[in-house]
């Protein structure tokens, strides 16, 4: 049962990461909640 909980947490972590990083064609052109003046957003890893 502990293995199942670890896998569940891992899957939800991947889903959260996928939602946090938009899969846009141009990773360098990411605008979050309107105009982003002081953002430090880096495309890629």
Swiss-Prot record:
Pfam families registered for this protein in UniProt: DIM
- Compartment(s) where it occurs, according to its Swiss-Prot or TrEMBL record: Secreted
Glycine amide, modified sites? 43
Tissues where this protein is expressed? Hemolymph (at protein level).
Inducing or repressing factors: By bacterial infection.
What domain of life is recorded for the organism? Eukaryota
Quick one: where is this thing mainly located?
secreted
Residues making up the propeptide = 21-27
Spell out the InterPro entries in the cross-references: Bomanin
Q: Where is the signal peptide?
A: 1-20
GO terms (BP aspect): defense response; innate immune response; response to bacterium
Q: Which cysteines are joined by disulfide bonds?
A: 36-39
Enumerate the UniProt keywords alphabetically: Amidation, Disulfide bond, Immunity, Innate immunity, Secreted, Signal
- One GO cellular component term, please give it: extracellular region
**Record's family?**
Belongs to the bomanin family.
Q: What does this chain do? A: Secreted immune-induced peptide induced by Toll signaling. Has a role in resistance to bacterial and fungal infections.
Q: What name has this protein been given in UniProt? A: Bomanin Short 2
Which gene is the coding source of this polypeptide chain? BomS2
């Amino acid at each position: 049962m502990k293995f199942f909980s670890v896998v569940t947490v891992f899957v939800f972590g991947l889903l959260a990461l996928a939602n946090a990083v938009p899969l846009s064609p141009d990773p360098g052109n990411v605008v979050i909640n309107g105009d982003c003046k002081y953002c430090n957003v880096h495309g890629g890893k």
